[in-house]
């Protein structure tokens, strides 16, 4: 049993090592690195607790003995120290977020925020949420499930303050889930910490479903997102929302779709049968999105993403169909009329290279007449915001500030 314990200890040591040195260069290894890195990093104290419980079990049965037992125990102790250091180091996100917002919006941006909105800002992470990361319901938030929209049986969920008034004219936040355009659901946990937080701040938050590949083929995904915008503009007033102020957000594939939606208002190929409908939004907050399907600048170190796109999403090769892939890429829709953006990316994302987000934000700043904030989080893995953690709490607070700033500019203009 000492050998078994040592093998388990080596696994724990690799999990800690993976936080600092994730795999980037091989498609399957990068996915494995993400699958272990996300929970180990963002739920670090929980992981340490459960690992300690397994070590306690081995101690009870006398398996931690001899050279192998001592070596295994030392590996576990070192791993826990490394995980704890990584976890608490993520508090740097507080400064990273504010720095990114100040660079993009201006150092005095918080003074431009409506006083009533500014008074709602939280400064300290919600420790209860962090202790119970899988608790998705909030007693102060009303959840309305499975509202139908669009032409293909799509559904969306609505979160709003439980005390909201029907004619409240609340600003709207639309969340688009990720999942490599092939899996994921509107209610699988993605974006819920942010949506619950903003609903308690007087926003209507919507999470919408869209057709997935391989049964769906691009542009089905973005068409469904556009139809969600049309429904919001035509139907959200009945729920107390303001159809004239919509911010769109999402992570990974949702980061791609939210960016593309924000940059392609009126693009007829994405609005078949409703070409004349208004699908404009007032801002976008993409997390770790994919912005260039052609990878023109060679940011991806392997062909894993290209294979997903060719085999499942487009069902055609990139070579010979470059224009199709470009049309689906937010990068090639950037113009001077792009709305305000807040782009969020981790440096240790093993699925989406940080360089791609840097390039996208740079191009947006060069071409758009609106503000662009870019927030880069040291050490953050892909999908870091799925769980309430120290890092995701500070990022959530930063997103709230961006949303409040954008909404304040809107209120000044009406």
Task: List each language-model region with its residue ranges.
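Alpha/beta-hydrolase superfamily serine-hydrolase fold, recognizing
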Residues: 1-414
């Amino acid at each position: 049993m000492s050998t078994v314990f040592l093998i388990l200890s080596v696994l724990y040591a690799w999990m800690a090592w993976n936080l600092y040195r994730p795999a980037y260069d091989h498609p399957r290894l990068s996915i494995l690195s993400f699958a272990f890195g996300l929970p180990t990093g963002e739920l670090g104290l929980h992981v340490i607790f459960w690992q300690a419980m397994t070590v306690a079990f081995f101690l009870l049965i006398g398996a931690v003995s001899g050279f192998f037992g001592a070596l295994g125990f030392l590996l576990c102790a070192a791993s826990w120290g490394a995980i704890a250091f990584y976890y608490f180091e993520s508090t740097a996100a507080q400064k990273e977020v504010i720095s990114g917002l100040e660079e993009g919006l201006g150092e005095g941006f918080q003074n431009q925020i409506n006083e009533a909105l500014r008074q709602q800002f939280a400064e300290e992470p919600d420790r209860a949420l962090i202790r119970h990361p899988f608790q998705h319901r909030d007693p102060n938030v009303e959840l309305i499930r499975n509202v139908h929209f669009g032409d293909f049986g799509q559904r969306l969920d609505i979160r709003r303050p439980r005390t909201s008034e029907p004619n409240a004219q609340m600003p709207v936040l639309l969340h688009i889930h990720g999942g490599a355009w092939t899996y994921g659901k509107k209610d699988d946990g993605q974006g819920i910490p942010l949506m619950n937080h903003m609903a308690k701040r007087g926003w209507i938050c919507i999470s919408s479903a869209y057709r997935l590949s391989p049964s769906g083929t691009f542009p089905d995904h973005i068409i469904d997102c556009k139809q969600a915008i049309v429904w919001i503009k035509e139907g959200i007033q009945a729920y107390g929302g303001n159809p004239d102020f919509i911010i769109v957000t999402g992570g990974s594939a949702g980061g791609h779709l939210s960016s593309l939606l924000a940059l392609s208002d009126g693009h007829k190929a994405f609005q078949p049968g409703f070409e004349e409908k208004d699908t404009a939004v007032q801002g976008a907050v993409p997390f770790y999105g994919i912005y260039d399907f052609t990878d023109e600048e060679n940011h991806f170190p392997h062909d894993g993403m290209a294979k997903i796109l060719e085999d499942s999403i487009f069902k055609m090769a990139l070579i010979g169909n470059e224009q199709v892939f470009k049309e689906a890429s937010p990068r090639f829709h950037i113009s001077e009329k792009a709305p305000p953006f807040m782009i969020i990316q981790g440096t240790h994302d093993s699925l989406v290279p940080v360089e791609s987000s840097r390039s996208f934000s740079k191009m947006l700043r060069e071409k758009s007449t609106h503000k662009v904030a870019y927030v880069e989080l040291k050490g953050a893995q892909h999908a870091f915001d799925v769980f309430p953690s120290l890092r995701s709490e500070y990022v959530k607070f930063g997103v709230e500030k961006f949303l409040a700033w954008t909404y304040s500019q809107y209120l000044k203009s009406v």
